[in-house]
UniProtKB/Swiss-Prot annotation:
NCBIfam families the UniProt entry points to: Q_tRNA_tgt, tgt_general
Record: residues binding substrate: 92-96, 146, 195, 222
Pathway linked to the protein: tRNA modification; tRNA-queuosine biosynthesis
TM stretches of this protein: none
Protein's UniProt keywords contain rRNA-binding: no
Broad class of enzyme this protein falls into: transferase
InterPro entries referenced in this protein's UniProt entry, alphabetically: ArchSynthase1/Queuine_TRR, TGT, TGT-like_sf, tRNA_ribo_trans-like
Family stated for the protein in its record: Belongs to the queuine tRNA-ribosyltransferase family.
Gene3D superfamilies per the UniProt record, alphabetical: Queuine tRNA-ribosyltransferase-like
Gene name in the database record: tgt
Protein name per its UniProtKB record: Queuine tRNA-ribosyltransferase
EC numbers for this chain: 2.4.2.29
Organism this protein belongs to: Acidovorax sp. (strain JS42)
Pfam families: TGT
GO molecular function, one term: tRNA-guanosine(34) queuine transglycosylase activity
Length: 390
């Protein structure tokens, strides 16, 4: 089940404010979706995700199929019961992970033959198998199996002919995914994925074919796969706003805070990316005034929080805690620097909470700006503040 309502639009861009109703709850859009690859957003309790405003999270079809396996998932009634998350979940199709295996896989019209990265077993993923796995996971949004068109093929930029071959296979797999999804009687929502590499004419062909299939929602895939930023932005400016206005639009695997705000301006409703969690574990933190490298020696004695304007547990602490010097109960940059240098577990937990809070709060501010008819002003202010530097 999926219902999508447009609540407001921006007159200076393609941005829109929406409300997405799914089987496990309502999602206010535009939204960022934290990535929970193995059934967990790394280092963060489900309760903390809810507290920071997460409305929908991702699960990884491929990895959950590998471990713990479908028998375990079925015994819990799906992914929600397994990971104790009562809000909506989106699962990818497994196509990107299979594509990432490189020489360990062979793609044919029927599907993908590959060796399990866990134990080396020979396995097969097809559109039908992907739909069966995602039906067992009982995710609210299911993604068609597609072939992620790479930016480079055999050491050269993917040619238009190579991108066409890949896009047309994804289009045929979309038909098979939809047929199997309907045969299984899956009560959730299936999204089609626009492919075509960096070629706008192929993107348009893919888009038109998928729209004819009448999916409940659509995604733009095959971006942020190694291409230069200007080419990614070019596709982002071309494709999303051409998708049906009355259906949700999802930009897969993107990206930086700047990418999210520009994506919203191009008509995107949904985003996911591992960047906030991965960067947190590697010591890069996002703030209102730019990115901060907590490993830099200059933070060794810094008493400031990561971001004085942030209300996450890392920056503001827990309610009711303060210090005699008037400071808040949050953690200093010096303390987070110390945890990182010592390899303490608490370090990446706190930085992950901060980065996710930043992303989710950014989308909340975007929604509020759209509600107020002020998205253009917000967009300009956001750019200026991020460019200022920490």
């Amino acid at each position: 089940m999926l219902k999508f309502e447009i609540l407001a639009t921006d007159t200076s861009s393609h941005a829109r404010r929406g409300k997405l109703t799914l089987n496990h709850g309502v999602v206010q859009t535009p939204i960022f979706m934290p990535v929970g690859t193995y059934g967990t957003v790394k280092g963060v309790m489900p309760r903390s995700l809810r507290e920071m405003g997460a409305q929908i999270i991702l699960g990884n079809t491929f990895h959950l199929w590998m471990r713990p396996g479908l028998d375990v998932m079925q015994s819990f009634g799906g992914l929600h019961g397994f990971e104790q998350w009562d809000k909506p979940i989106l699962t990818d199709s497994g196509g990107f992970q299979v594509w990432s295996l490189g020489s360990m896989r062979k793609i044919t019209e029927e599907g993908v033959h590959f060796a399990s990265p866990v134990n080396g077993d020979k396995l097969f993923m097809s559109p039908e198998v992907s739909m069966q796995i995602q039906t067992t996971l009982n995710s609210d949004i299911v993604m068609q199996l597609d072939e992620c068109t790479p930016y480079e093929t055999n050491g050269h930029k993917t040619t238009e002919a190579e991108a066409r071959k890949s896009m047309e296979m994804s289009r045929r797999w979309a038909v098979r995914s939809k047929n199997e999804f309907e045969r299984l009687g899956n009560p959730n929502a299936l999204f089609g994925i626009v492919q075509g590499g960096m070629y706008k004419n192929l993107r348009q062909e893919s888009l038109e074919a998928l729209v004819e299939m009448d999916f409940p929602g659509y995604a733009v895939g095959g971006v942020s796969v190694g291409e230069p930023k200007d080419e990614m932005l070019d596709i982002m400016a071309h494709t999303p706003h051409r998708l049906p206005a009355h259906k949700p639009r999802y930009l897969m695997g993107v990206g930086t805070p700047e990418d999210l705000v520009e994506g919203v301006a191009q008509g995107v409703d949904m985003f996911d990316c591992v960047m906030p969690t991965r960067n947190a574990r590697n010591g890069t933190l996002f703030t209102r005034y730019g990115d901060l490298k907590i490993r830099n020696a200059r933070h060794k004695t810094d008493h400031q929080p990561l971001d004085p304007s942030c209300t996450c547990h890392a920056c503001a602490g827990t309610e009711g805690v303060s210090w005699n010097d008037g400071g808040r109960g949050g953690f200093s940059r010096a303390y987070l620097h110390h945890l990182d240098r010592c390899g303490e577990m608490l370090g990446p937990m706190l930085t992950t909470i901060h980065n996710l809070h930043y992303y989710l709060n950014l989308m909340r501010e975007v929604r509020e700006a759209l509600d107020a008819g002020q998205f253009g002003a917000f967009r300009a202010r956001f750019k200026a503040e991020r460019a200022r530097g920490v």
